[in-house]
Amino acid sequence: MTLPQADVLAAGLVGRPVQTYVGLEVRIVGVENGAVVVANNRGGECARVSLADVQAGLDQLDAEGEVAVAFGALGPWATYVAAMLVEVDGVAFGDAPARVMRSAT
């Protein structure tokens, strides 16, 4: 299965809630100026996630089948990047250490 590009993934999530690895629900508010705008459950903006970080996560997921939910792998907003990645069909959170994985196809 081919993974989407970061901008396509993010645009498809606008207005939708996504869950982080620890179960926190956040909402994707929009995509602007190369970033995904993420809001907390009270409606306030809590992060601007670089589309480049989302794309890097997608690329690593495609190449290696998994990516760690960590700053070094997904950038400063790794938790939110991972929450977006698991919205792709066939992708889920894994345990110990926290990671995002593609299912075998």
Model feature map: region roles:
Residues 5-6, 54, 78:
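Short amphipathic alpha-helical segments that mediate assembly, nucleic-acid/protein binding
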Residues 15-16, 60, 64, 88:
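Surface-exposed polar/charged interaction patches
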Residues 96-105:
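Short, cationic-aromatic polyanion-contact patches
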Residues 71-87, 93-94:
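Short amphipathic alpha-helical interaction segments
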Residues 30-31, 93-95:
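Generic beta-strand structural signal
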Residues 1-47:
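Long, low-complexity, charged/polar intrinsically disordered regions in eukaryotic proteins
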Residues 48-73:
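Short acidic, hydrophobic short linear motifs in intrinsically disordered regions
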